[in-house]
Design a protein with these regions (language model features):
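Glycine-rich beta-alpha junction loops
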Residues: 120, 137, 199-206, 244, ...
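Short glycine-rich, acidic/polar surface loops and turns
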Residues: 239-259
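Metabolite-binding pocket within alpha/beta catalytic cores that recognizes anionic/polar moieties
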Residues: 1-176
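Polyanion-binding loop/helix "lid" in catalytic or ligand-binding cores
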Residues: 175-180, 237-244
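Active-site rim beta-loop-alpha module in soluble metabolic enzymes
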Residues: 157-230
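Short pre-catalytic strand/loop immediately N-terminal to key active-site residues, enriched for Gly-Thr
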Residues: 232-236
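Intrinsically disordered, low-complexity segments enriched in small residues
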Residues: 20-27, 202-208, 280-289
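His/Asp/Glu-rich mid-to-C-terminal helical/loop segments that flank catalytic regions of hydrolases
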Residues: 265-290
Length: 290
């Protein structure tokens, strides 16, 4: 029996678009570039040879076009894993649910999703300007723990090793380790990118060890994170979305990964706010390789 998705669960707008993104099924390409900043969608689309459509709703800005013969959708997601939950669920629904019958399509359509973002470097070999590809992402946000099958797509041994190393306080909720698509990593992350682990935090300040006016629950968090090593790789960076992206993509049978440019190095306490021109280099690399 076909699974029917009720209007209260899968919300479809009157114009036939998905609830938050306001995107219609025919407007979605198989290749998707994800960016946090809605304005960065235009930066990506400036490289397109042609523009097919443009849609904006709240922080979700979409442009679909072509680049060197490849049809690509560039989608902004805003900040945080909670927004990735919205974006990935709705993109998957556009690809794999018939909006007319509200039932799952018989043939699965696989999306290839690459997030281009900014991050904070955590190692001496990740100074500002470094491009980092997230091989595995440790989610501090807890989002994937709400979905069935999370253990099937996560690195449980790495999770346990990390919790033991950190003396993890269970009051924070269990971290999860999501795995990027290995073939996509090989395709995108070439010699000009550092491969490593990433931590996706549930916030920008306290969760990333920034003490402004409120004391930190674990003042030694970042030092412990920087020292962690597993299977010859270290945690290279902090950001706020890659774990949810990799985890949800795995559960939904899509291909996904994140590559970020370091704009702050927490180890060296350096920051580069004038990064917008430099990130264009990373954008072109991803466009060429996706």
């Amino acid at each position: 029996m076909e699974k029917y998705f009720a209007p209260s669960e899968l919300i479809i707008n009157e114009d036939g678009s998905c609830f938050h993104l306001h995107l219609k099924p025919e407007q979605l390409a198989d290749r998707v570039i994800l960016v946090g900043d809605p304005a960065r969608v235009n930066t990506v689309a400036n490289h397109f040879d042609s523009i097919e459509c443009e849609v904006s709703s709240r922080e979700f800005h979409t442009i679909t076009g072509t680049y060197q013969g490849k049809r690509i959708t560039c989608q902004s997601h805003g900040i945080g894993c909670d927004n990735i939950d919205i974006v990935m669920t709705e993109l998957d629904s556009l690809a794999n649910i018939d909006y007319q019958t509200r039932t799952e399509k018989k043939e699965h359509r696989t999306l290839t999703c690459v997030r281009i973002g900014t991050c904070g470097g955590l190692q001496p070999y990740t100074p500002t300007g470094t491009f980092i590809a997230s091989v595995k992402s440790i989610g501090f946000d807890g989002l994937l723990n709400y979905y069935g099958g999370r253990n099937d797509v996560c690195d449980i041994k790495l999770e346990e090793a990390f919790k033991q190393h950190m003396h993890w306080d269970p009051i924070k909720g269990a971290p999860y380790v999501a795995i990027a698509d290995e073939q996509l990593i090989e395709q995108i992350a070439q010699d000009d990118m550092v491969r490593g682990y990433t931590i996706s935090c549930g916030g920008f300040y306290g969760p990333q060890g920034r003490k402004i006016r409120i004391p930190l629950a674990d003042p030694d968090q970042n030092e412990k994170v920087e020292a962690f090593e597993y299977d010859s790789l270290r945690i290279c960076n902090f950001e706020m979305e890659s774990s949810a992206l990799a985890g949800l993509a795995s559960l939904l049978r899509h291909r996904a990964m994140t590559c970020c440019m370091v704009i702050a190095n927490r180890y060296a306490q350096e920051m580069n706010t004038a990064y917008k021109n430099t990130i264009d280099t990373l954008i072109v690399k991803v466009l060429d390789r996706i």
